[in-house]
Amino acid sequence: MEGENTTDPPYTTAASSGQSIFVRPPPIAPVLATTSNFSQSELKELHSMSIASTGFVSQSVPYSVTAQWGTNAAASSNVNPIPQASPMLANAPFGRPGTLAPPGLMTSPPAFPGSNPFSTTPRPGMSAGPAQMNPGIHPHMYPPYHSLPGTPQGMWLQPPSMGGIPRAPFLSHPTTFPGSYPFPVRGISPNLPYSGSHPLGASPMGSVGNVHALPGRQPDISPGRKTEELSGIDDRAGSQLVGNRLDAWTAHKSEAGVLYYYNSVTGQSTYEKPPGFGGEPDKVPVQPIPVSMESLPGTDWALVSTNDGKKYYYNNKTKVSSWQIPAEVKDFGKKLEERAMESVASVPSADLTEKGSDLTSLSAPAISNGGRDAASLKTTNFGSSALDLVKKKLHDSGMPVSSTITSEANSGKTTEVTPSGESGNSTGKVKDAPGAGALSDSSSDSEDEDSGPSKEECSKQFKEMLKERGIAPFSKWEKELPKIIFDPRFKAIPSHSVRRSLFEQYVKTRAEEERREKRAAHKAAIEGFRQLLDDASTDIDQHTDYRAFKKKWGNDLRFEAIERKEREGLLNERVLSLKRSAEQKAQEIRAAAASDFKTMLREREISINSHWSKVKDSLRNEPRYRSVAHEDREVFYYEYIAELKAAQRGDDHEMKARDEEDKLRERERELRKRKEREVQEVERVRQKIRRKEASSSYQALLVEKIRDPEASWTESKPILERDPQKRASNPDLEPADKEKLFRDHVKSLYERCVHDFKALLAEALSSEAATLQTEDGKTALNSWSTAKQVLKPDIRYSKMPRQDREVVWRRYVEDISRKQRHENYQEEKQRDYKT
C-alpha cells in the first residue's frame, strides 16, 4: 500500500502448540509524534530501537513486503507502534536469520555450524561456548540499550543484551535448532520453567536465575546427554522433507486483513497458497488489535484492551507484556484495599476538591480477575499521545486517598489505537465488564496539560485536507495518495484503515456535496444580482434595456457573477413588473375617467336615441368632459349607449328567463314527485320481500321447535325467542304476524294428526274387525273402549290429542254406518228391481 507502513505484522495464534491462545499479547509501544524531519538512516535507527525496547520476539512476514520498509519508512508519516520485522536475507539457508516466521514466533537463532559435523547448538537454558561464525553472512545484530538496567528473563524469551556484546534472542517455543544436524529441543533441565507457563511474546514477571545464552560459546554437554540428544538426529534433507508436509502449513491474517501462510517446521512465510493446502482460509479470523491502554496508578504497568474484548498487562519501562496479573499490581491493589478498610468511616481528603478531579482506584476484585476480565477502559485519541490525559476518580465506597496516592494516580495515562474498520464513539464513555470490580477510568486535569485534537476533530481536519487538495469524486486511493501523504492532517490519523475508510466515504459523498455547493453558490449569485437590481432601482424604469443597464452597472462584481442569459432574464423580469405597474395605473386612471364621463351622461338623461354630434355640443363646458382625452370621449359615449341597449335587452331577457325558470321549477317538482313514488314502490316491494323471508325463517323455526299440536302461544313464545339465529326477533315481522303463523302451524299439526288418525281407523276398523265381538257383545264399531284397545299400539293413536280421539272415532263410525246403510239400501233396491 503506497505511503503506508506495510510491515504491520498480524497477530496469530500458536498453531504449533495446539492451544487456542494468543502467541503473545498485542504489543503496545509509545507513539512517535512525527517523523517528517527524520532522515532515512534515523528512521531505521528508531525502528531498530523500537524493536529492541519492546521486549517482544521478532516477527516476520514475507520478505517481499518487509524488504521495502527502509524505502517506505521515509515516505510514511506514521511510525507503527508495533515492533516491525527486521530486514532479512532473501535466500538464507535453513535456520538462518533470513527464515520467515509468523508474528509472535521467533526465527531460528543466528548460530552457524562449525567444521565439526557433530557440533551441537545452544539450547534454551544452557551455557553456550564460543562458536565459529560464517564470515560471509552477517547475522542480525541487536543494538545495545545502555539506558535501561538488565532484567533477567525466562528461558522462553531473551531480550537484547544490555551490555556491549550483542546476544541472540531465544526461541519462544520448542522448534528445530540449526546446526550440522538439526534436532528438536529435548533434555531441558527440570529446574527451568516450561515455556507454556507464560504467554508467548511476553517476559515473565519474576527473574529466572542461571539462565543465560552467551553467543560465541558451545553448551557444556556431557557424553551421556549428547548421546540422548543425538538420538533423534537426521540430516538436513530429511528435515526439509518434514517441513514440506501439508499439515505444517497454517493460515493467518495480518492487521490489514491480508491472508498469508506459515510453515511451523521450516519457519517460512508466504502470501501464496501452498500446493495442496487443505485448510479454509476464508474462515481465518482477523487477529485482535490493541485499542486502548490505561496506566495503572502507582505502578509502571498499564492495562491494554484489544478490539475483541481481551486485556493484558504491559510495562512501560521494561517493555514487557503479560496475560497474568503482575505482582506489583497485586501488591498495589492490596495496599489500596487495606487503606480503604482502615478509613471507611473517615471523610475524603480535601485534596480531592482542589481541581474538581477524581482519582482512579483499583479494587481487589478487579485486579484478581486478571487482564481478560478487567473492566473496559475509556479510550481517547491515539494521535493525542502528547496530551497524555490524566484522570482521577474516587472509589464508590468513599475511600480517602492521600496526596501520595493522588500523585501516583495522576501518572496514569490513557491512549487509544483506532483499529482498522472500527469507528466508535467510545471516547467519553465508560463500559464495565461483568466482574470488573472497581477498576474505573480517571478524569483529566485540563489545567495541567494541553488538550490535543479529538478523534472527531482529526477526522474533520482529514476531510478538510481532502477538500483543499482537490480530491475529485469517485477518485481512487492509489491515485490521490501522493497528494495527501505529506500533509500533517494525514499523519494525525494513525490507522491506515481509518484513513482509507474516511477517504472512501469522502469520495462517495463529494459529488453530492459539490452539487449542493454549486447550487448554493448559484443561488447566492442570483440573490446578489437581485440586490444589485434593488440598489439600481432609481435607474430602472419600464423603458430600461439590457445595454443601458450594463453600461452603468457592468463593472459590479454582482453583475459578472452570473451568466448573461440569467442577467437578461432577471432584468427583464424587473422591467416587466414595472411595465405592468405602469399599465395598471394607466388603466385605473382611464377607468375612473370613463366612470365620471358615463355618470355625466346619465345625469343629462341621454337615451339610446340621442346623437353624439348634438350631445357633445351641450357638454363642452363640463369639467368631466374636458378631463377625458379627445379620442376617448366618443368611445365612452358609445359604450354608454351600448350599456343602455344591453340593459333594455336585459330586462326582456330577464323576463323570459324568469318564465323559463318557473316552468323549469314546475317540471322539477313533477319529476321529484314521480321519483318519490318510485322510491316508495321499490321500498314497499323490498319490505314485502323482507317480510316473506322473515316469515319463511320463522316458519322454519316453528317446524324445528313446535311439534305438539296442543302447544300454546304463551308457553312457546319464550322457547322461540331463545333461538341463536334470532329468527323470532326479526324487525320485519310484527308480533301479530308471529302469533298468526304460530297458530297456523299448530293447526296444520292438528290436521295432520287427525288425518293420520283417520287413516289408522280405516286400517284398524275393517269389516273383519267389526264382526269380532267381545264377551259382552261389543265390537270396535259400537264400543270406544273396544276400539281403543285395537288402536292404542299404533303411534298415530298417541299423536292424536286425547280429547279428540273419541270424537273422531264416532264420526268415523257414523260415516261407516251411513255408508253401510246406503249400501244395504242399494242392494235391496237392486234386488227388488230384479224381482
From Swiss-Prot:
Keywords: mRNA processing, mRNA splicing, Nucleus, Repeat. It is found in: Nucleus. Residues 1-22, 397-459, 649-677, 714-738 are annotated as: Disordered. One of its GO terms (cellular component) is nucleus. Residues 1-20, 400-428 have a biased composition (Polar residues). The keyword Transferase does not apply. Binds the phosphorylated C-terminal domain (CTD) of the largest subunit of RNA polymerase II and functions as a scaffold for RNA processing machineries. May be involved in pre-mRNA splicing. This is Pre-mRNA-processing protein 40C. It comes from Arabidopsis thaliana (Mouse-ear cress). The gene is PRP40C.
